Amino acid sequence: KSIFERDRRDWLVIPDAVAAYIYEAVNKMSPRAGQFLVDISQTTVVSGTRNFLIRETARLTILAEQLMEKIKNLWYTKVQGY
């Protein structure tokens, strides 16, 4: 399988990984500022926005996968004649 088929959902974890790296860096410099980031990340606005983005990104990923399957089927049936 190509890298796109094998790892196509792994990119969804990138925002969480970036947030974790930022938290670790800030927490090493100032534990108080790190705690502030934790408190902010647990507010309803931030968690609601995060959940919305995850839900919509997952929906778009599924739609993109379905589109790729349709294109593949079209390619095999109409262009190559299988």
Swiss-Prot record:
Family matches, as InterPro entries: Apo-VLDL-II
Keyword Plastid belongs to the record: no
Signal peptide annotation: none
Tissues expressed in: Found in egg yolk and in plasma.
Keywords attached to this entry: Storage protein, VLDL
GO cellular component: chylomicron; very-low-density lipoprotein particle
Pfam families in UniProt: Apo-VLDL-II
Record GO terms (molecular function): enzyme inhibitor activity; nutrient reservoir activity
A single GO BP: lipid metabolic process
Membership in a protein family: Belongs to the apovitellenin family.
Function noted in UniProt: Protein component of the very low density lipoprotein (VLDL) of egg-laying females. Potent lipoprotein lipase inhibitor, preventing the loss of triglycerides from VLDL on their way from the liver to the growing oocytes.
Subunit structure: Monomer.
Protein name: Apovitellenin-1
Origin species: Meleagris gallopavo (Wild turkey)
Lineage: Eukaryota, Metazoa, Chordata, Craniata, Vertebrata
